[in-house]
C-alpha cells in the first residue's frame, strides 16, 4: 500500500460529560495553563503538517464551545455529537463524506492533549502501510489481575496485552461502514478499532508513548500540566 499522504482529517468526539471528574463542566472544558483541555488537544493536532482540518463533535446544547476561539477557526468544523462515541464519530464522518474532505481520518480523544507529533508520524506511516489501518497503543507493563466481587480471580498473562490509545487512523468509508454495521447489530463499540475487530479485521498496533494518556480522574490534571510543560514540539 502507498505510504504517500497529502493530508488527513482529524475527528475529535467531544460530546461526553466526563462524570468521573466530578467537575462543574465536562472535562474537556477544564483548564490547564489558561486553556481548556479541548483547546490543547486540537491545537496539537493542527500543529502536525499533515493534519489539514479538524471535525469536532459537540453536543447541540453545549454552552461552553461557542465561547472558545476554536469556534472561529476555519480549520475546525463543528458537527452535532451523539449520545455515544460511535454516534459522534459517525456524525463527523458524514460531514467529511459530504464535503469530500479526505479519504483518511484519524480519531483522537478530546481528553488526550499530550500526544506527541512524533507518535502521529508513526501512526500515519503504520496506517498507510496496512490494509485496515492502525492505532497507537502502549504495551502493558504492570501485572494484570482479573477480579470479581472485590477479589482476585487470577493473574492475566500480559505478554500480548496493549493499552489502546488514540489517534486511531483508518480510511473514512470503511470506518463508516464498520461503525454503522456494528451499531445496527447492537455491538458495544468502545473505540474505532473494535468496530473493525467485530468484522474480523485486525488493525495494526503502533507503539506509542505512555504519556499520551487520557485525562479521566481529577488527579490526572496535574500530570497533564507537567507533560504539557515538558512537551515543546
UniProtKB/Swiss-Prot annotation:
One of its GO terms (molecular function) is 2-C-methyl-D-erythritol 4-phosphate cytidylyltransferase activity. It catalyses: 2-C-methyl-D-erythritol 4-phosphate + CTP + H(+) = 4-CDP-2-C-methyl-D-erythritol + diphosphate. The record marks 158, 214 as: Positions MEP for the nucleophilic attack. Keywords: Isoprene biosynthesis, Nucleotidyltransferase, Transferase. GO terms for biological process: isopentenyl diphosphate biosynthetic process, methylerythritol 4-phosphate pathway. PANTHER family: 2-C-METHYL-D-ERYTHRITOL 4-PHOSPHATE CYTIDYLYLTRANSFERASE, CHLOROPLASTIC. PROSITE patterns: ISPD. This is 2-C-methyl-D-erythritol 4-phosphate cytidylyltransferase. SUPFAM superfamilies: Nucleotide-diphospho-sugar transferases (SSF53448). Belongs to the IspD/TarI cytidylyltransferase family. IspD subfamily. Pathway: Isoprenoid biosynthesis; isopentenyl diphosphate biosynthesis via DXP pathway; isopentenyl diphosphate from 1-deoxy-D-xylulose 5-phosphate: step 2/6. It comes from the Bacteria. Catalyzes the formation of 4-diphosphocytidyl-2-C-methyl-D-erythritol from CTP and 2-C-methyl-D-erythritol 4-phosphate (MEP). The record marks 20, 27 as: Transition state stabilizer. Its EC number is 2.7.7.60.
Amino acid at each position: 500500500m502507498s505510504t504517500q499522504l497529502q493530508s488527513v482529517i482529524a475527528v475529535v468526539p467531544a460530546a461526553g460529560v466526563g462524570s468521573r471528574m466530578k467537575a462543574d463542566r465536562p472535562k474537556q472544558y477544564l483548564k490547564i495553563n489558561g486553556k481548556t483541555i479541548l483547546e490543547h488537544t486540537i491545537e496539537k493536532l493542527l500543529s502536525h503538517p499533515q493534519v489539514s482540518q479538524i471535525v469536532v463533535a459537540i453536543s447541540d446544547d453545549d454552552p461552553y464551545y461557542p465561547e472558545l476561539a476554536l469556534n472561529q477557526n476555519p480549520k475546525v468544523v463543528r458537527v452535532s455529537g451523539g449520545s455515544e462515541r460511535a454516534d459522534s464519530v459517525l456524525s463527523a464522518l458524514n460531514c467529511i463524506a459530504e464535503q469530500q474532505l479526505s479519504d483518511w481520518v484519524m480519531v483522537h480523544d478530546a481528553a488526550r492533549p499530550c500526544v506527541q507529533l512524533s507518535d502521529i508520524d508513526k501512526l500515519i506511516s503504520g496506517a498507510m502501510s496496512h490494509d485496515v489501518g492502525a492505532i497507537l497503543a502502549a504495551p502493558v507493563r504492570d501485572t494484570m489481575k482479573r477480579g470479581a466481587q472485590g477479589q482476585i480471580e487470577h493473574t492475566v498473562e500480559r505478554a500480548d496485552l496493549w493499552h489502546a490509545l488514540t489517534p486511531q487512523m483508518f480510511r473514512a468509508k470503511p470506518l463508516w461502514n464498520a461503525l454503522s454495521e456494528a451499531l445496527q447489530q447492537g455491538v458495544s463499540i468502545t473505540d474505532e478499532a473494535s468496530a473493525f475487530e467485530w468484522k474480523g479485521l485486525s488493525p495494526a498496533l503502533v507503539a506509542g508513548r505512555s504519556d499520551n494518556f487520557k485525562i479521566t480522574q481529577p488527579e490526572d490534571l496535574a500530570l497533564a500540566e507537567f507533560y504539557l510543560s515538558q512537551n515543546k514540539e
